């Protein structure tokens, strides 16, 4: 079975070669999320980070992150990625109108910005 890449929640798919071509030509929107659990006073008690294997096989911490799909709001993308990466018991409370604390641009060219993604030009709302 060929791996395919989802681009919207209605079931449209791009073949991997087509997605690679799109990534070469278009900036892709992403969300970077740092989910936290707070106590009744609003103090942070827990931070939701992921453990992933790096390219050299080491286990590293990573933030929840992923693409925004076609016809998906930023809020929906945040909730989807938190549930996908941290599980349904994460039960995120996402603000009605989330506001990013920063915007990061990832470029395929090293040194073009502090952020590098060799696959694409990505714009990430953090």
Regions found by a protein language model. Give the residues of each.
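Acidic, metal-coordinating catalytic segment for phosphate/diphosphate chemistry
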Residues: 1-41, 114-124
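Short N-terminal secondary-structure initiator segments
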Residues: 1-11, 75-99
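Generic secondary-structure boundary/loop-capping signal
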Residues: 19, 23-25, 60, 65, ...
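A generic structural signal for short beta-strands and their flanking turns/coil linkers
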Residues: 29-31, 57-59, 64, 94-99, ...
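Short regulatory "switch" loops immediately downstream of catalytic or recognition motifs
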Residues: 34-40, 83, 87, 104-108
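Conserved Nudix-box catalytic region and its N-terminal flanking loop in Nudix hydrolases
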Residues: 42-91
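Active-site segment of metal-dependent pyrophosphate-handling enzymes
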Residues: 87-126
């Amino acid at each position: 079975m060929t791996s395919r890449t989802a681009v919207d929640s209605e079931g449209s798919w791009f073949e991997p070669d087509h997605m690679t071509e799109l990534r070469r030509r278009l900036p892709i929107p992403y969300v970077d999320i740092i989910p936290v659990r707070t106590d009744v006073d609003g103090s942070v008690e827990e931070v939701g980070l992921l453990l992933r294997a790096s390219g050299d096989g080491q286990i590293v911490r990573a933030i929840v992150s992923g693409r925004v799909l076609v016809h998906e709001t930023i809020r929906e993308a945040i909730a989807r990625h938190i549930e996908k990466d941290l599980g349904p018991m994460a039960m995120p409370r996402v603000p009605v109108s989330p506001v990013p604390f920063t915007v990061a641009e990832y470029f395929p060219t090293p040194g073009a910005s502090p952020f590098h993604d060799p696959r694409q030009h990505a714009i990430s709302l953090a």
